[in-house]
């Protein structure tokens, strides 16, 4: 069982856990859900991850990591835009990194979606509002 942050963020409440307890009580198996969510990936999405990781850069002090996914990368790997969702977590998992940023080209226009994640010391919601 999980929520979007795997129960690790401050907005995870006791209500969240009560809902999960109810799901377990009706027969949902946590191991099976975990496997389906975290241990299942398509080859296309895995190839996209490899492409994206090759774009990663760090600030000199190693506290900020950023990477990007282009429309060409999506086309080359035949991955879906949904396949980009967990990529930012690889940047955030690097030791010393406090802020991770993912730039994603979306759709047929020239828009770029920017996602921020932090380990908690920095309120990235303020950055996202800029």
Region locations from a protein language model:
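Catalytic-core segments of class I nucleotidyltransferases/pyrophosphorylases
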Residues: 1
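Hydrophobic helix-and-loop "lid/oligomerization" segment in the mid-to-C-terminal part
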Residues: 4-130
